[in-house]
């Protein structure tokens, strides 16, 4: 069966809120094996919403609505669906009692306006809202299905999981199983070129590349009724890809680079220290956002000025004078200084020009050097990033974490 998502709310069209509901529902429908070919966003207008319903029903079997189930006059999803299907809205005492109980539990009397939410489409399946006042509904009409869900994600998602997932599972025997490989240090076009035979000659599993900020994701997907069979197919394809590009793969699915780095440090019993200039503490922030980071993160230095680099890290004034703060030499001395003045096994450093000012003819905005030091090894790497100040800082911090990842592998 084919589904369509219809998100209702003028605030979505005005860009006042981000439509996370559509993203969530798209992912869940895919995992359930329900085909989704269209998404529609409609403002709070009865006639336009009915028009969207008319178009959707000509091409889809299941319509999933989010939003427009509130108590105010601009909440018109129930009204539009019922008018289109020729259904009446009937006051349901049980629903009304639950809404009144919701307010009583919070020590306030239910506003009269909320009584509107107790009117339900005749013949519908009522979906209880355990996190708000707007119930959801499933309406079956002449082989078509309309599923009405509240707009707030913290209400919509639990309702979908508890009631809609079991309902939809009966329509698809097969599910889509996916695995995402996460790459860093290589571009989308380079990945496609090196995997061209796999990508273009492969139908099961399917492969799809997605460029993300400073990294690339490759989704491997297969549609199967047996999870074990699906896992075997995904495993085999992952092995083929790792044989070709394994050095660039840092994680899978929802893993972040910092999570992977912290886990690797834990596994090897290592500690890290960080000396930052152009990234201004962003690397330390990323690492310490990971639970358990206290076991592997020793300390961080934010040495923005040349004076701080000299005083805190022992960078040579002569090196600064001869090569400048943004240089291989300073990056290496920063990393060595962070290692020497800490209890770490590995130290990394950043120095660069985040812009928009500070560039010279030989040192443009986006030039960053990342240093790394262990007791037996010191090196630095040059990167050239583009974008505004925040984008360059983010790119540099990810590149530094990747340098750290590779150093841990070879430690």
From Swiss-Prot:
Pfam families xref list: CinA, CinA_KH, MoCF_biosynth
Residues that span the membrane, as ranges: none
UniProt xrefs under Gene3D superfamilies: 3.30.70.2860, CinA-like, MoaB/Mog-like domain
Superkingdom assignment: Bacteria
SMART domains: MoCF_biosynth (SM00852)
InterPro entries, A to Z: CinA, CinA-like_C, CinA_C, CinA_KH, Competence-induced_CinA, MoaB/Mog-like_dom_sf, MoaB/Mog_dom
NCBIfam families, per the entry: cinA_nterm, molyb_syn, PncC_domain, PRK00549.1
Matching PANTHER family: NICOTINAMIDE-NUCLEOTIDE AMIDOHYDROLASE PNCC (PTHR13939), NMN AMIDOHYDROLASE-LIKE PROTEIN YFAY (PTHR13939:SF0)
Full protein name: Putative competence-damage inducible protein
């Amino acid at each position: 069966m084919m589904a369509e998502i219809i998100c209702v709310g003028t605030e979505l069209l005005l860009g006042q809120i981000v439509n996370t509901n559509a993203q969530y529902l798209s992912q869940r429908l895919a995992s359930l094996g329900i085909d989704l070919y269209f998404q529609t966003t409609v403002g709070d207008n009865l006639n336009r919403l009915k028009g969207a319903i008319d178009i959707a029903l000509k091409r889809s079997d299941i319509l999933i609505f989010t939003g427009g189930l509130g108590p105010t006059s601009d909440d018109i999803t129930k009204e539009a669906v019922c008018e289109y299907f020729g259904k009446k809205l009937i006051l349901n005492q049980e629903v009304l009692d639950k809404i009144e109980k919701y307010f009583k539990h919070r020590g306030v009397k239910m506003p009269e306006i909320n009584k509107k939410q107790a009117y339900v489409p005749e013949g519908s399946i009522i979906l209880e809202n355990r996190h708000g006042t707007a119930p959801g509904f499933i309406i079956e009409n002449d082989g078509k299905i309309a599923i009405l869900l509240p707009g707030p994600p913290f209400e919509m998602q639990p309702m979908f999981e508890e009631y809609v997932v079991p309902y939809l599972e009966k329509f698809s025997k097969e599910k889509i199983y996916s695995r995402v490989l996460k790459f860093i240090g290589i571009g989308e076009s380079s990945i496609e070129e090196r995997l061209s035979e796999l990508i273009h000659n492969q139908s099961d599993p399917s492969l799809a590349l997605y460029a993300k900020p400073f990294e690339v994701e490759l989704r491997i997907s297969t549609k199967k009724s047996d999870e074990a069979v699906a896992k075997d197919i995904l495993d085999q394809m992952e092995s083929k890809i790792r044989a070709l590009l394994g050095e660039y793969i840092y994680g899978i699915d929802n893993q972040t680079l910092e999570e992977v780095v912290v886990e690797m440090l834990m596994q090897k019993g290592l500690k890290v220290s960080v000396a930052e200039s152009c990234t201004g503490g962003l690397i330390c922030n990323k690492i310490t956002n990971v639970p358990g980071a206290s076991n592997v993160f020793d300390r961080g230095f934010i040495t923005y000025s040349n004076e701080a680099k000299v005083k805190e890290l022992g960078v040579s004034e002569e090196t600064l004078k001869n090569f400048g703060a943004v240089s291989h030499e300073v990056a290496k001395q920063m990393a060595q200084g962070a290692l020497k003045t800490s209890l770490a096994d590995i130290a990394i450093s950043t120095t660069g020009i985040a812009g928009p000012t500070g560039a010279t003819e030989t040192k443009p905005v986006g030039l960053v050097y990342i240093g790394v030091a262990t007791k037996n090894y010191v090196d630095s790497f040059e990167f050239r990033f583009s974008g505004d100040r925040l984008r360059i800082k983010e790119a540099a911090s990810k590149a530094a974490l990747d340098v750290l990842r590779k150093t841990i592998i070879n430690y």
